[in-house]
UniProtKB/Swiss-Prot annotation:
PROSITE patterns, A to Z: U_DNA_GLYCOSYLASE
Listed EC numbers: 3.2.2.27
Cellular component GO terms, alphabetical: cytoplasm
Disulphide bonds in the chain: none
Function: Excises uracil residues from the DNA which can arise as a result of misincorporation of dUMP residues by DNA polymerase or due to deamination of cytosine.
Species of the source: Escherichia coli O81 (strain ED1a)
BP terms from Gene Ontology: base-excision repair, AP site formation via deaminated base removal
Protein name as annotated: Uracil-DNA glycosylase
Amino acid sequence: MANELTWHDVLAEEKQQPYFLNTLQTVASERQSGVTIYPPQKDVFNAFRFTALGDVKVVILGQDPYHGPGQAHGLAFSVRPGIATPPSLLNMYKELENTIPGFTRPNHGYLESWARQGVLLLNTVLTVRAGQAHSHASLGWETFTDKVISLINQHREGVVFLLWGSHAQKKGAIIDKQRHHILKAPHPSPLSAHRGFFGCNHFVLANQWLEQRGEKPIDWMPVLPAESE
């Protein structure tokens, strides 16, 4: 069955492609030469570590990792415990407060509990130089993450894709709308949230879709690992 496949099963061949090896080599060379790259090497593929292929129910696409100290840890929009919640995530919390009964904004921005429930928090570019947004945008990461999206499209059924902003929405072309559910809105960034991210109701609509399919809805209240034990 498709849900028994692992990321390793479907990505092993892609990870041997010359472009991918070149991407890894470029990032490794920059780190070795003293350039600060986020996230740390051990965290680059955390989205796949925390959400197994067979568990993917929702995909939230980000662009590239946060480029400030200690922020990025491999999950789109998420920051480590103890790091100030970034503006886009604050706006996501605001939308959750306005639409999910009982949701109260947490005092952290760590979204591992979403990932553990089947929310793939995938940046389309997986590394960035410190302080330089989009500095690794042309390294080949997008070829890899486009492949990831196409593999989810192929091997999973009934996944909700939350595509926020024009960059993410372009990825909609890869997704079969007959097999999956696509929700589009402006990006939650302060620059665009007021143009329709607020009021998009995506978190509610995603759960309604999952429940209609007989699946467990996502608990959107982010909890720190110690709290959930």
